[in-house]
């Protein structure tokens, strides 16, 4: 494996025996030849099962409707794209010239599809139990945060919808500082929003939590002045 790919597998928490499976999972159909859509089909089904099974175990008294809503939140495209950005997947995607020019490596749908394809690739490279363990590791924070009956839209989603409803550009999140040791880090994120003079700062124990904190603050400022 090349060093960059080693960096990716470290973020994924899984080292492939068949590296070609990972390469295939990262190959978009625009690149011509073999691509990741069959792996995506497989990974989509595995992800849905793993999350449904985990919700069933975690919430023994919750009804089917609430569990369905929670699962939909966890497996929807923008959640998967968020995961893809946490893995910096855009740096590894194999895209055709047209998609490269149009910024396909940043597109939610392409990132989400690649995450599902990687799940399918992990399953084929190992077994269902290993794929389940890896998926649950990726989703640990999200599973701890999600609650039945509550609004399933997180601050980043609500901020995105608020801006889209006003035909404004999407916010841009940038990590400006990381402090502390590997298992006790504090992330600082700047959130730039069109129409706001200065970036909004958020802090958290992970990049995602810092982004959510920044989005929450930005929403408060936009809605309450």
UniProtKB/Swiss-Prot annotation:
GO cellular component, one term: cytoplasm
GO annotation terms (biological process): mRNA processing; regulation of gene expression; rRNA processing; tRNA processing
Residue stretches making up the RNase III domain: 5-127
Any Pfam family hit: Ribonucleas_3_3
Necessary cofactors: Mg(2+)
Subcellular location: Cytoplasm
Xref: CDD domains: DSRM_RNAse_III_family, RIBOc
PROSITE patterns: DS_RBD, RNASE_3_1, RNASE_3_2
Annotated InterPro entries: dsRBD_dom, RNase_III, RNase_III_dom, RNase_III_sf
Residues annotated as binding Mg(2+): 40, 113, 116
Residues spanning the membrane: none
GO molecular function, one term: metal ion binding
UniProt superkingdom: Bacteria
UniProt keyword list: Cytoplasm, Endonuclease, Hydrolase, Magnesium, Metal-binding, mRNA processing, Nuclease, RNA-binding, rRNA processing, rRNA-binding, tRNA processing
Active site: 44, 116
Enzyme Commission numbers on file: 3.1.26.3
Record domain DRBM: where: 154-224
Catalytic activity: Endonucleolytic cleavage to 5'-phosphomonoester
Record note on quaternary structure: Homodimer.
Family the entry assigns: Belongs to the ribonuclease III family.
HAMAP family registered for this protein in UniProt: RNase_III (MF_00104)
Free-text function comment from the UniProt entry: Digests double-stranded RNA. Involved in the processing of primary rRNA transcript to yield the immediate precursors to the large and small rRNAs (23S and 16S). Processes some mRNAs, and tRNAs when they are encoded in the rRNA operon. Processes pre-crRNA and tracrRNA of type II CRISPR loci if present in the organism.
The protein's name in its UniProt record: Ribonuclease 3
Organism whose genome encodes this protein: Vibrio cholerae serotype O1 (strain ATCC 39541 / Classical Ogawa 395 / O395)
């Amino acid at each position: 494996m090349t060093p960059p790919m080693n960096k990716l597998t470290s973020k994924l928490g899984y080292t492939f025996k068949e590296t070609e499976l990972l390469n295939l999972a990262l190959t978009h159909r625009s690149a011509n030849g073999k691509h990741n859509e069959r792996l995506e089909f497989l990974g989509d089904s595995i992800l849905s099962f793993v999350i449904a099974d985990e919700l069933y175990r975690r919430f023994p008294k919750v009804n089917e409707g609430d569990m369905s809503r929670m699962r939909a939140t966890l497996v929807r495209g923008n959640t998967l794209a968020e995961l893809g950005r946490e893995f910096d997947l855009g740096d590894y995607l194999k895209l055709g010239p047209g998609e490269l020019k149009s910024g396909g490596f940043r597109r939610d749908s392409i990132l989400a599809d690649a995450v599902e394809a990687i799940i399918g690739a992990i399953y084929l490279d190992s077994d269902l139990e290993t794929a389940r363990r890896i998926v649950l590791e990726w989703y640990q924070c999200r599973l701890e945060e999600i609650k039945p009956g509550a609004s399933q839209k997180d601050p980043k989603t609500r901020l995105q919808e608020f801006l889209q409803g006003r035909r404004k550009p999407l916010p841009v999140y940038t990590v400006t500082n990381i402090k502390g040791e590997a298992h006790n880090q504090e992330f600082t994120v700047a959130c730039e929003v069109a129409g706001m003079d200065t970036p909004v700062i958020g802090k958290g124990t992970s990049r995602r939590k810092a982004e959510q904190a920044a989005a929450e603050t930005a929403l408060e400022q936009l809605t309450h002045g």
